Every structure is written in structure tokens, then in C-alpha cells.
């Protein structure tokens, strides 16, 4: 994304980007929690705030970061992540909107250019009928394209094929698959894993390999070795982020 690359000038040094970060504000009056009980939501209680993360970020040599809206903590209230991205030029926000709220289109328009760089289509728990690629939700994709927002999709395995449909219809839109769609990629024979790998045929689909994916691979394979080479065989290294 152009805003993430802007201003980077370290000669001989590759930019290191944390592509999936969740933070929780310490000021609960200004940024009240609106919890959703997703499995594993306990992390919300121990998550760092922006000041704590920035120190860790500097010590680890991370140049920039994508602050992903945590649905488990704030659902569709993006106030905290937008506040952080407005104060810290090295952090960029990925927001969630309510697809059923008619005011969401205006919400997207109000995102400040260069601070919010992506939308996260959050479809968990899975709906009875998938909405991410539904014609009546096309306005989300069109508005995202108009504002040059990357589209991140967080779904469970039963909606993986919907991502392919979206990637085909909106072929100029980058589509990032959060958590590799929760596919059990350690088992290459699993139909869900095959559905994920089939998305490689769409050049605008990118896989996000988060710690959930890495931990699952290690638990089943005993080592991280082989994970990224396996995914790169299908998607290439240029379409993997972690």
C-alpha cells in the first residue's frame, strides 16, 4: 500500500511490517469495550495498549504495523484503532463496518486517507446465507476500491469458496484471507485445505499466516519448517504475509 511505503528510506534494509496486530485501549471510559464471545476471546483481558506495543515494536526492529480491528473487543466501533493510527504514523488501521447498517457507507467515506488502509469483512459466526459477495453488498467493495482500501476477509472454512467468487468479480481488489481461513493446512488431504489452495488461481488473493496458523502447524507437524515453503508452492512468496 502506497501509504505504508511512503517515507521509508532505510538503505539496504527491508521494511519489516507486523501485518496483524490487536491492541486494547487502557482508557475504558474513552474507549469502552463491546465484547463478543468468540472462542479464545480471553486474550482481550491481557492485550497490550499502543504505548506498550510501540516500545516492543521499536525493540524488535519492526518498522510499521497494521492495527486490525478486534471484533471480540470492540465489534464495529473503530474509535480506538483510528485514534492510534492518527497519532502514530507507523501504525495503520484495518477497520470493520456493519454490513447491515445503511450508515456504514458514510462511515467508510469518513475514514481518514492514509490512516485507515483497509476494511475487514468479518463474517464470524457464519451467517445462514453468505453476504461477503452478495450483490446487495457490492457497495462495500465499490467504496473500498474508490478509497484504495485493501479488503481483508475473516471467515470460517465454509465460506472459503465465497472468497474466490469475490476475487473473480472484484479482480482489481486485493483480497487478504485472514488466518488462512482457519483451514487445517497441516492436512493437505483435507477438503477445506484444498479449497484454500484453490484460491491461488486468483492473482489478487493474499494469505495472511498468523500465529494461529503457525501454532496449529507446529502442533501437528512438530516444527515450523515446511509451512511457508508449502504455501509458497501455490501462492508464491509475494502473496504471503505474516
Language-model features and meaning:
Residues 3-70, 75-76, 112:
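An N-terminally biased module of ancient metal coordination in phosphate/nucleic-acid-related enzymes
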Residues 17-21, 65-68, 92-95, 117-121, ...:
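Hydrophobic faces of well-ordered beta-strands that scaffold small-molecule active sites
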Residues 22, 70, 96-100, 122-126, ...:
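Active-site beta-loop-alpha junctions enriched in small/polar residues
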Residues 37-46, 92-100, 125, 129-131:
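Active-site mouth loops of central-metabolism enzymes
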Residues 56-106:
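A metal-dependent hydrolase metal-coordination microenvironment
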Residues 101-153:
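Hydrophobic alpha-helical segments and helix pairs
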Residues 133-242:
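Catalytic pocket-lining loop regions of alpha/beta-barrel enzymes
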Amino acid at each position: 500500500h502506497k501509504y505504508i511505503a511512503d517515507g521509508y528510506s532505510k538503505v539496504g534494509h527491508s521494511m519489516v511490517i507486523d501485518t496483524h496486530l490487536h491492541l486494547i485501549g487502557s482508557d475504558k471510559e474513552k474507549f469502552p469495550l463491546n465484547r463478543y464471545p468468540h472462542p479464545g476471546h480471553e486474550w482481550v483481558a491481557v492485550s497490550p495498549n499502543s504505548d506498550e506495543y510501540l516500545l516492543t515494536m521499536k525493540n524488535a526492529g519492526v518498522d510499521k504495523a497494521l492495527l486490525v480491528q478486534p471484533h471480540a473487543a470492540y465489534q464495529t466501533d473503530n474509535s480506538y484503532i483510528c485514534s492510534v493510527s492518527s497519532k502514530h504514523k507507523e501504525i495503520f488501521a484495518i477497520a470493520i463496518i456493519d454490513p447491515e447498517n445503511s450508515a456504514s457507507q458514510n462511515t467508510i467515506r469518513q475514514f481518514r486517507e492514509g490512516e485507515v488502509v483497509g476494511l475487514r469483512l468479518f463474517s464470524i459466526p457464519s451467517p445462514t446465507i453468505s453476504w461477503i459477495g452478495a450483490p446487495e453488498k457490492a457497495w462495500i467493495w465499490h467504496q473500498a476500491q474508490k478509497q484504495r482500501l485493501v479488503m481483508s476477509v475473516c471467515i470460517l472454512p465454509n465460506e472459503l469458496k465465497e472468497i474466490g467468487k469475490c476475487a473473480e468479480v472484484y479482480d482489481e481488489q486485493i483480497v487478504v484471507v485472514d488466518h488462512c481461513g482457519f483451514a487445517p493446512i497441516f492436512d493437505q488431504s483435507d477438503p477445506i485445505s484444498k479449497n484454500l489452495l484453490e484460491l491461488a488461481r486468483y492473482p489478487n488473493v493474499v494469505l495472511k499466516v498468523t500465529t494461529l496458523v503457525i501454532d496449529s502447524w507446529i502442533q501437528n507437524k512438530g516444527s515450523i519448517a515446511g509451512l511457508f515453503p508449502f504455501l509458497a508452492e501455490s501462492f508464491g512468496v509475494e502473496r504471503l504475509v505474516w
